[in-house]
Amino acid sequence: MSIKIGQASLGETGGHGQQPGNQTGRELNFSTWYPAVWLGVLRFKDPAKAELAAKACEDGVKNKNIGYDMDNRNTAYAAAKAVGWDLSKITKPVETDCSALMMLCAISAGVHKLEDLFRRQGNSCTTYCMRHDWPQTGEFELLTAAKYLKKDEYLLRGDVLVSSGHTVMVLEDGKHGEEEREVVEKSKIIVDGKEVSVERILKNGTNYVKVRDIAAALDLEVSNKGNIAVLTHKEK
C-alpha cells in the first residue's frame, strides 16, 4: 500500500478560468504515492518544520475554501498571509495550484525566506523555482537518488516530491523512514583553530559526533568501562 500524499490537482473543469474554492471536493485532495517522472525530493533539514508543513498541507486540503486555478493561484497566498499562514483559517473562496500550495505549506512551517522570494518574483514558485531556489534558503536538501524518486519506501512525512509539472507533499513515512531519520555524513570540527574531519550523525534534528572522533581531535586516548567512554591524556 502506497503512502499518503496531499496535493492540488485540477480545477472543476481544468486549469484556467475556474471558480474560487474547491468546487468538486477534489481540486485539493488526499491521494496515495504514485510512480511519475519525479526529478527531486525537497526534504526539510529541520524535522519539526517538516511536521508543520505536513500539518499545513492537511489543513489546506480539508479547507474547501481553497480551490485550484492557475490564473488566480496567488489569491490563497494573500488570504493565508492575512491569517498568519494558518490554512485552516481561510474563510473566503480563493485559489492556488500545486506549487503555490507547497509554498504556502513551507511558509506556514517557518521558511520565511520564501516570502522574500515571493516579493522579488511577485509570484508563487513554479516547480522549476522550487528545485532551484528552495535549497538556496538553507532549509532543504534536494534528494535525487533513485531510491527517493522511484519508490516511496524512503520518503518522510513533510517531504515534497517535484516533477517538471507537478508537486505533492508526503504525509506518511515510508516503511524505511526510520532509517532516513539518522543521517551520517562527513563533517569537521575546529579545535584551537585547526579543522579536524569527523563523522556527523543527524538524528531527529540533533547533531552527534562519535566519541572516538572527538578523542582523536583532542589527542586523547579512548577506552571504555562497560558502556562508559573513558578519555585520558596520551603519555608523552
Regions found by a protein language model. Give the residues of each.
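Short beta-strand-to-coil "C-cap" segments at the C-terminal boundary of structured domains/repeats
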Residues: L42-D46, V170-H176, L231-K236
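Short, structured beta-strand/loop micro-motifs enriched in basic residues and often containing a Trp
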Residues: W134-L149
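Primary recognition of N-terminal secretory signal peptides and signal-anchoring hydrophobic helices
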Residues: M1-I3, E179-K236
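Helix N-cap / beta->alpha transition motif
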Residues: D97, T126, K210-D213
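Loop/turn positions that initiate beta-strands
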Residues: D152-D159
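N-terminal capping segments
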Residues: M1-R119, S164-H166, G177-E178, E185-D192
